[in-house]
Amino acid sequence: MPLLVLHLFAAAQNKKQLVSAKKYNTVVSKETMEQVFDEIKTPHKYGIVFKHPDANKLMDSPTIFKKNGVWYMTYIVFDGKGYETWMAESKDLLHWKSLGKILSFSKDSWDANQKAGYMSLVDIDWGGSYKVEKFQNKYWMSYLGGNTIGYEAGVLGVGMAYNSTLTKPVEWQTATTPILQPKDIDARWFENKTIYKSTVIRDKEKHTSHPFVMYYNAKGDTAKYESIGMAVSDDMVSWKRYGASPVITKYKGICGDAQIVKINKLYVMFYFGAFWKPGAFERFACSYDLVNWTDWDGEDLIKSSTDDDETYAHKPWVIKWKGVVYHFYNAVGKSGRVIALATSKDLQTK
């Protein structure tokens, strides 16, 4: 292609991006942020809704979706060796039954001892179907992977698993190499040490010019804190990083475990914070374009206040169903590491 044509093409692309960017506000107003808080807040702690059948194992990171009138949860379990991924089911969001493992330890692979999975392409519409979308006739699940034994030990990266069925407790297929890892040549300053939890959504509006968007928390070799960054894809297999900086960071402690929902035309990111003030707690941010996020500066959505979450109250999955907001989170306290629930209405009162 002649040099002049290349320059003209690049200019056209830049102009297209600028025109697209002008369609959306990059900052969400304080009034709107307060309205969102009023919509999503869950002041009533229901308590523990799920313990792993083996109480000696630690559970974490719920992802909840629905199929054929039944609710399902993927969650991860740490047994002293590493993470594996399990599935549970419920008819009412309050009582859960474990179904079995879907990502297990393996041998001689990059992810042999760590497979912490998070279901991809869950419907993000607030009060929506919460169904999981198929792409190329497969269901997809990103996961934290690594081959070192221990709690989030060694070099961790993001893998992608897939399966033809969604709700059966069968082993999912995994790729032989990670899709993102901290040693990648294009790894950014805030992620070149370790990459942790990820979440993948379909961006129907293509705000980034790509249909699939991933958010993940990561730590850098000099940035010794966790921030949330972005990556994009056209096919769920090949991913490229998006932007030069994290979309959410406090430059200390942890910002992590993002979940994205869409309330009308506004995107809401639930995430947890830790150690940039005491404890671990649930927060949120808002965006009109999935790229520019306004962080909430008010009170926590969830914080430690009971025996069951006295140590940590963190790692959100939030849905609205039949007029009630359900905020699932990982509670760490006197009952161990379990899944707890807070709601917008008091479900304990009959």
Regions found by a protein language model. Name each.
Residues 1-15:
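Bacterial Sec-dependent N-terminal signal peptides
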Residues 13-117, 121-197, 201-256, 261-311, ...:
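Beta-rich carbohydrate-recognition and catalytic domains
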Residues 316:
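Extracellular glycan/ECM-engagement signal in secreted proteins
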